């Protein structure tokens, strides 16, 4: 006599061994918990890195000036826009390093090369847009505001009345 077949073949699921790993758990049952743990760990690492960087900067004796104090020096009555590297202070305000806030922020001990022609420069002429050192032949004066500009930041305007150089700030308003 032949073997009798199972009457519940369609209703019973197959019983196979299934490997459930960390990937399956992190996308399935424990998805919210794992994503929260990853978020907290990432946030903790970011804050530790920022704290370590801030401690490293403060240990180098880089005194920090507030933005308003760095804007006071410059043309009489007209505040200069802040150029160069800015730092976010512990209170959330933008600050500048003392070396950058000083006149040009260039060291006086080593000779400096012009950023355009590589001649030796005394460090007095600095582009008002990108703060690169310039020699006397590579410096251009803006026709609109009188600021110093380099070859890269100055825009030559060849109009009917001759050539005039505009800085990038004034070139926006002329166009």
From Swiss-Prot:
Q: Where is this region: Interaction with BCL2L1 isoform Bcl-x(L) and inhibition of BCL2L1 anti-apoptotic activity?
A: 36-55
Modification type Phosphoserine: residues: 70
Tissue occurrence: Highly expressed in testis, heart, liver, lung, and muscle, and less in kidney, spleen and brain.
Q: Is the Flavoprotein keyword given for this protein?
A: no
GO function term, MF aspect, one: tumor necrosis factor receptor binding
Q: Which residues are annotated with the PTM Phosphotyrosine? A: 34
Question: How is the cofactor bound, as the UniProt entry phrases it?
Answer: Isoform 1 binds 3 zinc ions. Isoform 2 binds 2 zinc ions.
Required co-factor(s) are:
Zn(2+)
Q: How is it modified after translation?
A: Phosphorylated by ABL2/ARG in response to oxidative stress.
Quote a single Gene Ontology cellular component term: cytoplasm
One Pfam family assigned to this protein is Siva
Name used for this protein in its record: Apoptosis regulatory protein Siva
Species this protein is from: Mus musculus
Upper lineage: Eukaryota, Metazoa, Chordata, Craniata, Vertebrata
Q: Gene for this protein?
A: Siva1
